[in-house]
Amino acid sequence: MKKLFISVPMKGRTDEAIRNSMEKMHKIAELTFGEELEVLETYIPPEAPDGANPAIWCLGRSIQKLAEADYFIGIGYTDYFHGCRSELSIARDYGIPCTYVDPYECEFLRDAVEIAAGRKEERKNIPTEVVLL
């Protein structure tokens, strides 16, 4: 059976929301690719070693899993989902057949969109001027 890599936003989301998104995306991928697919375990708990950047550490682990994939499903608009953007780029660059969903149109991804929108608002409050002393 061919293997499917599922890329979903994880930062700030509950385990339940992540698993629910993955389950729905699995079904979408099977319909899209026209065959039953084995899902690679891509949910990686953030257990980075001390001193490591947890987001980059998790991304590195997920890229190792991506090397085993025959197919890829992710999200289409990745502006605020940096790990998802990197995974999609790698899958495309290395010839893995890809499909994706629009996170703004999928109810099961609404929480991820809201979290990303909150991060966008936080960034607006970061001073952009540099003061030289």
Protein language model annotation of sequence segments:
Residues 1-133:
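Conserved catalytic or regulatory cores that recognize and/or transform ribose-phosphate-containing ligands
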